[in-house]
Amino acid sequence: MKKASEIGHTVKAFDEDLGGLRALICEMGGLTEIALTSTLEALIHSNKELAAQIVEKDKEIDALEIEAERVAMRIISLRAPLADDLRDVIAAMKISGILERMADYAKNIAKRVPILQNMVSIHPVPVLPVMGEMVSEMVRNVLDAYAARDPKKALHVAEYDMEVDGLYNNLFRILLTYMMEDSGRISTCIHLMFIAKNLERIGDHATNIAEMVYFAATGKQMPERTRGKDLLASEGS
């Protein structure tokens, strides 16, 4: 039988491992949030130097995902966590993958910044920065929900998803109208459509993180929510 001191040491070591994993996820989330806000700044101000920095720094987020997965697997194999602790580890592992994909979407937007500089300009589309700000707020809030392990905050983030879908569909219609009115705008509008789609997907992934936070905190699946219609998918079907 283990002595009380040995049990205490094991519990402390486990808590340190779990804390280290959560710290990795928070660091990864912070870098992903910076990537998104910097991408929006680069896009709005046509800053190709900033866009290039975003593309380069994506490697750091990729490396953190690999490290988070390694730490999570080590905890599972050595500590055999149960109940709440197991949910925390599984959630962290899944969230790290989601954050990496979100950062990839931000990187994809950044790659289009120098391309758009050399294309036919169009009238400002006010919906795009509004959509970007809403998605940024979703990401910021869901990271706060994860740090606080707060299921109510997670639910609030998920409620934004349909609003983002609505903005995306609104922007889709605006850009479609531009293309119909002037064929010279088609290439620019297509790039903007892909940017909007990437933002919409980041919003979806923020909601996926909210679902994992809710699950880790409560042990239950987040209640079903209404999803907006994807006009781009509808056009292709």
From Swiss-Prot:
Keywords for the protein's UniProt record, in alphabetical order: Cytoplasm, Phosphate transport, Transport
Molecular function GO labels: protein homodimerization activity
GO CC, alphabetical: cytoplasm
Subcellular localization, as worded in the UniProt entry: Cytoplasm
Primary location recorded for the protein, binned into one broad class: cytoplasm
Gene3D superfamilies, per database record: Phosphate transport system protein phou homolog 2, domain 2
Family classification: Belongs to the PhoU family.
Protein known as: Phosphate-specific transport system accessory protein PhoU homolog
Organism: Zymomonas mobilis subsp. mobilis (strain ATCC 31821 / ZM4 / CP4)
